[in-house]
């Protein structure tokens, strides 16, 4: 059974992050210390109310990769050393939930990317992960994997993605709402 993938629209989410340009080979050793810096800031100097129950996040801006590792927060803030204010992107996304070992997280990314391409969606660039809270009895956690999509891009199934995440049929090369205006009465 494949990994279920859905398309939806998400709002930008403010984050406190440490940003870096790394290689994929060095990223596994770098993300932990980056995240530790963010948590030190949140515990020892963040503005009151900045953190209320956000999750750990990793944003991959490109293939370099330029990455941001941090935590969801409630608003933007002034930078404090290496910890800066940023945001997870908003807009149309393909998303799946990873429930297996972290070592297999790449499989979920491949599933989201492959599913999107197979349906004619154009990937828009950034992708990110939002780490859920650990289960108190097992220590296991889920990871939501998001890939940005170009809105309105027609799919091979004869549908188009709306900016709100809706999927509408294509009629005469136009989304149904537009196509219906151009049909003879």
Give short role names for the model-derived ranges.
Residues 1-185:
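A solvent-exposed interaction/effector surface
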């Amino acid at each position: 059974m494949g990994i279920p993938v859905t398309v939806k629209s998400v709002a930008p989410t403010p984050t406190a992050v440490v940003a870096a340009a790394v290689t994929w080979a060095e990223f596994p050793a770098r993300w932990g210390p980056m995240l530790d810096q963010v948590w030190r800031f949140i515990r020892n100097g963040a503005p009151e109310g900045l953190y209320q129950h956000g999750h750990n996040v990793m944003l991959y801006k490109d293939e370099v990769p330029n990455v941001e590792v941090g935590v969801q927060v409630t608003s933007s803030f002034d930078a404090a050393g290496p910890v800066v204010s940023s945001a997870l992107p908003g807009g149309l996304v393909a998303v799946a939930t990873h429930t297996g070992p972290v070592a297999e997280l790449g499989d979920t990314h491949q599933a989201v990317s492959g599913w999107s391409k197979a349906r004619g969606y154009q990937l828009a660039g950034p992708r990110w992960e939002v780490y859920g809270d650990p289960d108190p009895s097992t220590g296991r956690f889920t990871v939501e994997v998001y890939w940005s999509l170009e809105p309105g891009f027609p799919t091979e199934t004869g549908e188009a993605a709306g900016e709100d995440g809706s999927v509408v049929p294509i009629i005469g090369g136009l989304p149904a709402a537009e196509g219906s205006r151009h049909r003879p009465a």
